[in-house]
């Protein structure tokens, strides 16, 4: 595009008006080389951890190789990860299974700065991904679960869907954990055909 040299002052004022931009979301397709093997490993585990989330989880399987790979994606946008939350009551690296009967709610993940979801069900409904929301109450896409808008976590009439990442096999979604988000839908009725 060719510009008019007489508009140089306008260009500088536009450049000075940029905000402090922030990366909120990274999508990585083809995360695992041997995704079928990872899926089989996941399905061979005990899904016996039940908590304040839909479905059931395994214990955490966080390892150096996975941490390094995630760190390489996040570093340019968020700097070095200093806490992988490896205590017994955290779920970093765990597998989660849920079925069509499960339900979620709009929430944030207050205990960390970034969150991640890796889709491990082949041929899943693409509409069963992760949705991101803006509050109709205060217009914010960021918050904490104890905010007043968090009281409306299950009332989707109080929210606008502002972004969605589809569920694609072997897709990793990394996102700022203070964004309002939820799982879009669930499917299946057993570990082999449920949302992993």
Description of each model-found segment:
Residues 98-196:
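Catalytic core of non-heme Fe(II) oxygenases with the double-stranded beta-helix
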Residues 3-106, 129, 136:
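Non-heme Fe(II)/2-oxoglutarate
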